[in-house]
């Protein structure tokens, strides 16, 4: 099985759009349709999920799993992202390229839609 550092967000923890977010090492099944992370078995929704692409076969919780972004803006909306201890150095050094922060166990992601909201607010304020 192949393993890789990924962004994992439990959409069932929040309102369906946001939830607890982590950077951690996952293992993929041979087919790549199942991901194993911290004892959970996540199966692909095959494109049928709303803001989620995997679900936990044991709990039914929905997850968004993707490769971590180099700029750290993995979340849809501003939120805190925890970094698992076993991937911390590799994540900060190899993915983010910021060796000075290897001791950081979490960071704030401004979110994918943060800049869009600022632009929309600015446009709506023009007279």
Residue ranges and their predicted role:
Residues 30-37:
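Short, conserved beta-turn/loop elements at beta-strand boundaries and strand-helix junctions
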Residues 1-25, 40-127:
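Mixed-charge, low-complexity intrinsically disordered regions
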């Amino acid at each position: 099985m192949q393993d890789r550092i990924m962004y994992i967000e439990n959409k069932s923890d929040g309102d369906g759009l946001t939830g607890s977010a982590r950077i951690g090492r996952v293992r993929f099944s041979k087919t790549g349709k199942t991901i194993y992370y911290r004892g959970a078995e996540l199966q692909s929704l095959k494109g049928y999920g709303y803001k989620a692409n995997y679900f936990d076969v044991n709990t039914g919780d929905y997850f968004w799993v993707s490769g971590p972004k180099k700029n750290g803006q993995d979340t849809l909306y501003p939120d805190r992202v925890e970094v698992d201890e076993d991937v911390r150095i590799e994540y900060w050094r190899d993915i983010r390229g910021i060796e000075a922060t290897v001791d950081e166990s979490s960071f704030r992601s401004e979110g994918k839609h943060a800049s869009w909201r600022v632009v929309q607010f600015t446009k709506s304020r023009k007279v």
